[in-house]
Amino acid sequence: MNKEKFTLIGAGLAGPLMASYLAKKGYFVEIFEQRPDMRKESISAGRSINLALSIRGINSLKEVGLYEKIKNHAIPMKGRMIHDLDGKTHLQPYGQKEDETIFSVSRGKLNMDLMTLAEKTGKVSIRFNHQLLSADLDQNELIFQLTDSSEEIKSSFSKVIGCDGSASILRKAIVNKTNANYIKKPLGHGYKELTIPPSKNEKFQIEPNALHIWPRGKYMLIALPNTDFSFTCTLFFPMTGETSFETVITEKDVLKLFQSQFPDTVKLMPTLVEDFQSNPTGDLASVYCEPWHFENKALLIGDAAHAVVPFFGQGMNASFQDCSVLNQLIGQYADDWTAIFNDFSTTQVENGHAIADMAIENYLEMRDHVNNPVSYTHLTLPTNREV
């Protein structure tokens, strides 16, 4: 029996992982990606350069045979290192077992490895520089614009899976066609990435095997280690208000904020002001959508279905779990795609909404529990809740 061909929108993290699962089951897959091939061109996605990989994501990478390779380039983080205002630190271990460790991984390297893994199956092709403009779910037709020439092309599909992120065009088509429930909830806070570089003798400046957190009430700073001995820091901060991205603008503003709220970081970040002023400010929002499919034709996974605030990697791990669950359902129902899509949408919607809620709760708890030492223990959540 000939296997149907799948069309996937988006070659970020979820897309090529799902393609590998499908290829292992004998399906041919064509992925359309709006960006150039990052393995050939240096591109910026405007997003975190490292992510926290936990048990949900680890299990998925094991299933496609990529975990050991990724682990070799990952840094284990055995707990949260809480930084008080006075410079004191408190390590909160995640646990004693190996699966209670999370890993700092490079988004870019992971993305490239996932694409290469998918292509090596011989059943997956990736068409870069193709931006989806619209989807006609009745006619099974997609319209793309070539980002390097502005030419528009049409492509037909049999089954299409949207892995195209929080601004998903396929989700828009499904919502319009099904009157699906859809809400995008802005958090009112944004984020900006900063850097703690290696020391002069090319070593880590702070403890590498921990996820560092500076909770400060209405805002917070976190830092994850990189394999080049640097740390990627993320400042979660109000978008508007008296102390916000709207008001912290000048060199004086930036230094005042960090010297008063994160004093132990200033000496570690020689390019603090430059990074703050030049790096983009990302917004924080959660996406709630239901259902995630249209008939047996179209399905959403990952951020396209359930975007969450970018907080300690829930998005990636939950997206990877989506791929694993869908793979299991394909095995369970064979080629009954109506049953597969229905079951996936029914079971995963609740999980997706729960993870989105949990991400916000974690963020609010972590940033607000600053002056209460008792709360630090309270915040040591089980690793299977994605930290």
Label each region the model flagged.
Residues 295-309:
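Short FAD-binding loop at a beta-strand-to-alpha-helix junction that anchors the flavin cofactor
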Residues 88-105, 236:
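Helix-loop-beta segment of a Rossmann-like dinucleotide-binding subdomain
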Residues 4-81, 98, 102-109, 158-159:
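Glycine-rich FAD cofactor-binding loop and adjacent beta-loop-alpha segment at the N-terminus
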Residues 116, 130-134, 139-284, 288-293:
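Conserved FAD-binding catalytic core of PHBH/FMO-like flavoproteins
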Residues 9, 32, 163, 301-302, ...:
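Active-site flanking residues adjacent to catalytic metal/cofactor-binding acidic residues
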Residues 312-321:
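A conserved FAD-binding loop/helix module that cradles the flavin
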Residues 121-132:
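A conserved beta-strand/loop element that lines the FAD pocket in flavoprotein oxidoreductases
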Residues 2-4, 328-381, 385:
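C-terminal helical "tail/cap" subdomain of flavin- and related membrane-associated enzymes
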